[in-house]
Amino acid sequence: MDRVTFEGLVSQALEELPEQFLNKLENVDLVVEPWPNQQTLTGLGIRAGGLLFGLYQGVPKTKRTGGTLLPDKITIFAGPILLVCKNEGEVKDKVAEVVRHEIAHHFGLSERSIRKTGH
């Protein structure tokens, strides 16, 4: 799958979020990268051979105290997603899952809380 098609799936996943979340999503950059770098994987404690599909970097809305902040950043990693998916339908579903997961972090949900919801 080419980058343009993959980025289109990321945009579609964002547009398909429920309106109550879209309306509160602010000051967030959503980017696509091919693969996470080794420094990122090591920093997150991901061992060799482990995969990272997405990454939220920023201050969750629940922890903000005011003032101007740099935009949060959500990175979706195309390489790992394409590696585990067998067809475009699976890629679309995985991208949607990862986008929802990372946006949940933006709204202050922990990894444990997100996993309890099935994402």
Model regions and ranges:
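Catalytic glutamate of the conserved HExxH
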Residues: 98, 102, 106
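Active-site rim/adjacent substrate-binding subdomains
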Residues: 1-94, 106, 110-118
